[in-house]
Amino acid sequence: RHEFNAENIKPRDLYETYLPPFEALVKEGKVKEVMCAYNRFEGDPCCGSDRLLMQILRDEWGFDGIVLSDCGAIADFYRDYGHKTHPDAESASAAAVLSGTDLECGSSYEALVEAVKQGKIDEKAVDVAVKRLLTARFALGEMDEPEKVSWTGIPFSVVASAGHDSLALDMARKSMTLLMNKDNTLPLKRGGLTIAVMGPNANDSVMQWGNYNGMPPHTVTILDGIRKALGSDDRLIYEPVSYTHLRAHE
């Protein structure tokens, strides 16, 4: 993902296969922040792609919010194990901002001061990104007293309500796509099943949260979820050892 170049994508495939989910989120969901990806698109890193971030996202779809890079994506522009499309952090940061990436998850944008001094980007272009960022922070109420911001007082009981749990479950179910069902394997026949569950993460609740997350009131592990779904005459075999990890160190 840090070196891959998605290229020679036909316009019809782009607009009918890849873009519709994102377009719906922008136009119908009214999202205020979009994250640009690690990989390249037709030779340009996604976070430095005028085609994606300016022409399509902002001009065609009318997006006026913030574009944030995935973590370390700007450094991929110039580091050896990345795309190597730019010689240094100054060039990479300037290109990203000029292409519409307002905020970086990382430290490459620290080079923007030097990039301005070197003439690689005008200070007015940086101001455009800063204005978008400050507009969002004001809209979130970050500059107001907490008691004046309506959503700072929402209790956890509302956030983790039964209605929200039900909605999250429904969204998860509808997000799944079955690409192939060889030999009609699914749905699994109930009764007399033997299920093997492999790896330590199957029984690790914290792993499921991700690395920037809220604190859920409870977590059902993958292993517990499978156990709950099985019948009394089904058999479950759980092996917590990570065989991939072992092979990597042999």
State where each predicted segment sits.
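Glycoside hydrolase catalytic-domain context in secreted enzymes
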Residues: 1-247
